[in-house]
Amino acid sequence: MRHTTLILIGLFWGTFLFSQSSKPNIILVLADDLGYGDLSCYGSKRIQTPNIDAMAKEGLRFTQFYASSAVCTPTRVGILTGQYPLRFNVSTHFNDRVMFLDNDVLTIPKQLKTQGYRSMHIGKWHLGGLNEAHISDRKNSMPGPLQHGFDHYLAMIEDPQYRGVAMREKRLYKDAGKHLAKDDTILPEDSRHWTNIKFDEAIKFVKSASKSNQPFFLNLWLDAPHAPYEYSNDEALAPYQKRSQGQDLLYRGMVTHIDQGVGKLIETLKALNIDQNTLVIFTSDNGPAYLGSPLHFKGRKTDFHEGGVRVPMIAWMPKTIKRDQTTDVISNTVDFLPTFGSFAKAKGAKVITDGMDLSSVLKGKANTLDRPTMFWEISTRYANSGNYVNVTDVRMTPVANQIALNKQWKLLAIEGDPKELYNLEKDPYERWNLLELKPEIATKMAKELKAFLDAPRKEKPY
């Protein structure tokens, strides 16, 4: 009887391990301030990104993919929670000393943990809880990555005297290694370039995780190519030395530096023979800032025209995702939570999300989604700042701080008051404002926007 019991336990445990290992690994690589037109595979003629281009050639490229905000923190809230950031009263950058995302909400790592996943966050956080005082007294302070469900994290300490000073003095990427924390422990100084540290740590995590039967989720949030524009490496700068200089040269090098890291990460997956069981997503948190390119789209970071929120998105998973595909399915960063849950075969209580499961699109089983109206809001302080305008941009004054988008129709509003209406199917570059010609559409969408803005939401995140 005892032997029978042991055999049954062994069979059960073997089945459990097999079911865990059959779940796909998931890697999300998020660039910072990378424009729609900053990758060769999205039309860039000025920056070379051969490894990311290869991802697109071997996978699926989205042409109408949106960040859930035109600035940093709100998009990150949308990614982790699968909900519009305004539901948490987040419409601007966090003051990391006093603001934070509450840890009572479901996040991607929490959801995946129920399916046996181990997880790690690497890189920029910007969701509160990573000041030195928070790290050293977590029980009496605000939540950080561990409290939001990650098993491990590596990030730069976000105190202004570290991050803020390094950015102002244009040495963020050079000096970030002096101010790192891992799993709520402050680390010794590391002299490597910040982008190299992140990709090295990502590869280290992947190698370690691949030795177990446990699927993994890697959340790799880069700082690059966000300003300050700094030296990357000679190889990354080499293609541009003859035709570029100064800040523009540094920016191009930073994007190619990202591409180098992505290439090494993909090579690692192939060398470990886990590439066919690993979903890799590459995207950006918002449109480009000063030197990046929105391609032909109007606007850039902080602006709710297309250039500020339409971003690159590439999905790669050999055999599961067909090679060299493009899709114009309208999608959003809030879709990651339900999509990753679907790939992980997550079951249980119904998940509250504004996102949609993109798995059928990724697997080539659907080329449309019956998507309800999507909504955005940004603080008017950022919308009207004009910090990222260049001479080629055409912006209204003041700039719209809200969007309602349904299929081809996009309404821009200021505090609920409609200001612009575009048919993106016929006018993706937003040249012809149809507000006066299509008042019935504008009125209908304005009512939907008002209902969303008036819906209950969490108290402010502090």
Residue ranges with predicted function:
Residues R2, F18-E415, K419, P428-Y462:
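Formylglycine-dependent sulfatase
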Residues R2-I9:
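Sec-dependent signal peptide recognition
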Residues Y422:
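Conserved, charged catalytic cores of large soluble enzymes
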